[in-house]
């Protein structure tokens, strides 16, 4: 990301909360600023949104603003909403179409793997999420997008989270939406994908 560029954040409620002062999107914008890069954010996270809804609104919400970059965070609701969710085959089509649209509009795309649904990897929903995230890793390779593997980062961060944090709420407030520690984890993951060094990543802390 270069000085003066625009970054669109497309996502669900996790991204909507990411626009708050302690949210991952704002932490990233502030981290860029600390490195002398002033980026203009477009925050477009909407609670409950799935890949089909994001595909319908990506032009209006993000691409009409001609962003240089777009982060794409989608998958939790596709899985979490069960029968009202989006099956894997449709998810693949929707996410591929979103990336194609963004790249055709001249935006570089950074894909975020979906963070965990409750902080227990053995849970049914997290197991169901695995093929969705595996697809995102493949999509990033195929389309030459950057990838922030936040699901892997979250699993690692939970292993080292202090024992005095409440069980099930070490990185989240409710098992899904990030607490300040989770937002730092996400911001660092995205910044790492953008090429931040370990020293630069260490400066991203809770606000």
Annotate the PLM regions.
Residues 1-5, 203:
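Short N-terminal segments immediately surrounding and downstream of signal-peptide cleavage
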Residues 5-20, 49-50, 79:
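Catalytic nucleophile-elbow at a beta strand-turn-alpha helix junction centered on a G-D-S/GDSL motif
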Residues 11-13, 45, 76, 115-116:
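Short, histidine-centered active-site or binding-site loop motifs used for metal coordination
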Residues 26-40, 52-206:
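Alpha-helical cap/lid subdomain in secreted, periplasmic
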Residues 41-48:
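Catalytic cysteine-centered active-site loop
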């Amino acid at each position: 990301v270069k000085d003066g560029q625009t970054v669109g954040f497309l996502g669900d409620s996790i991204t909507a909360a990411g626009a708050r002062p302690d949210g991952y999107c704002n932490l990233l914008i502030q981290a860029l600023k600390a490195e002398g890069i002033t980026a203009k954010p477009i925050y477009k996270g909407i609670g409950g949104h799935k890949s089909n809804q994001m595909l319908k609104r990506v032009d209006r919400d993000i691409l009409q603003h001609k962003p240089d970059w777009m982060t794409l965070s989608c998958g939790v609701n596709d899985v979490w909403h069960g029968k009202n969710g989006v099956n894997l085959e449709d998810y693949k089509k929707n996410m591929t179409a979103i990336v194609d649209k963004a790249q055709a509009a001249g935006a570089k795309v950074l894909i975020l793997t979906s963070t965990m649904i409750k902080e227990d990897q053995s849970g049914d929903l997290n197991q169901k999420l695995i093929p969705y995230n595996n697809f995102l890793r493949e999509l990033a390779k195929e389309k030459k997008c950057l990838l922030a593997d936040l699901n892997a980062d979250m699993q690692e961060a939970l292993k080292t989270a202090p024992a005095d944090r409440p069980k099930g709420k070490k990185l989240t407030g409710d098992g899904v939406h990030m607490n300040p520690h989770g937002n730092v984890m996400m911001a660092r993951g995205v910044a790492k994908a953008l090429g931040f060094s370990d020293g630069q990543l260490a400066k991203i802390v809770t606000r």
